[in-house]
Amino acid sequence: MTWDVDATLAQIRRLADAGCEIVRVAVPDDKSADALADIVKGSPLPVVADIHFTWKLGLKAIAAGVHKVRINPGNIGGESRVREIVAAARDRGIPIRVGANAGSLPKEIIAKYGVHDPAGIVEAALIPIRILEKEGFEDIVVSMKASDVGLAVASYRLAARRIPYPLHIGITEAGSAKRGSIKSAVGLGMLLEEGIGDTMRVSLTADPVEEIEAAYMILSAVGLRQRGPEVISCPSCGRCDIDLIGLATTVEERVRALGTKIPLKIAVMGCEVNGPGEARDADVGIAGGLHEGLIFKKGEILRKVKEATIVDDLMVEVEKVLRDKEAEAAAAAAAKPGTGA
């Protein structure tokens, strides 16, 4: 619960450690709103207040010092209420996120468009946007979420053509960790490849830290951002003479335990066919064999090792590469103007 300041801040710190850059907290009641000032003060991340139904909670959240407020045009109330939130946000110099959701569209939108029309979702967002613009307020972020991937993608594509404000993208109510990650990867991956999206969230019914991990995996997969090492591995087949599944899992765990944020590609391959050749772009990797394996670096074989020590031998090379990359990063930082001694 948001009103539990200690628990909320503990979760925010975990998210920050995982790489989260903005955090949104639900503000369902006055007790939660009253806790916001302490949460904002103790949070290492910008705090966004998520407001539904009770517009006065938005005013309390803004007064508490939140960095952004999110309102839902489907349930926040009439134009006069939106105007009051705008006035408070302008006084504080914070943006407003307009969040249209396919599951809570205004009645007049449903009557005109139904519930599965991207035009209806975009129009639901445009209604409060026009009110904000009429008040001369343009510090706006827009989202239009749906749990249906196709509907969400089509809505964001239409919004990108019609709305001149930053877009926060996501697939809402995506599901459990596995299903939700797949749905989010499909939908957000398409949008990101098209250059659509300024901020993003992967919504999962899971530990929220898993949302951050999934988001970085999606960003890495489309070549936008990479945070920390990436372990790639091939599917097992009849050529594989090693416990590839167990090997890949162990390597993932060992690499995660390093806690490094340095980008690094590590390959775990089942045989010489998929080894140094197909994974030649990996910084370092292993290719399994019968009771043995090959350690390779950028496609070049370094040495043959025993199966019993293959993970330890790989990690030795991983740590060498990390040290080299750390030294390169330090040298590059020192060479920048104003950073030298």
What does each of the following model-derived ranges do?
Residues 7-15, 27-64:
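N-terminal active-site wall of soluble small-molecule enzyme domains
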Residues 101, 109-256, 261:
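Catalytic alpha/beta core domains of metabolic enzymes, predominantly
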Residues 1-7, 26-28, 45-53, 109-122, ...:
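Active-site mouth loops of central-metabolism enzymes
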Residues 22-29, 46-53, 69-77, 121, ...:
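Catalytic beta/alpha-barrel core
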Residues 63-77, 81, 108-120, 301-304:
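Glycine-rich tight-turn/loop motif centered on a GG-T
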Residues 30-51, 84-96, 156-167, 251-256:
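Alpha-helix-loop-beta-strand connector modules within alpha/beta enzyme cores
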Residues 50, 98, 142, 191, ...:
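Conserved, mostly hydrophobic/aromatic
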Residues 45, 56-97:
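Hydrophobic or amphipathic alpha-helical targeting/insertion segments
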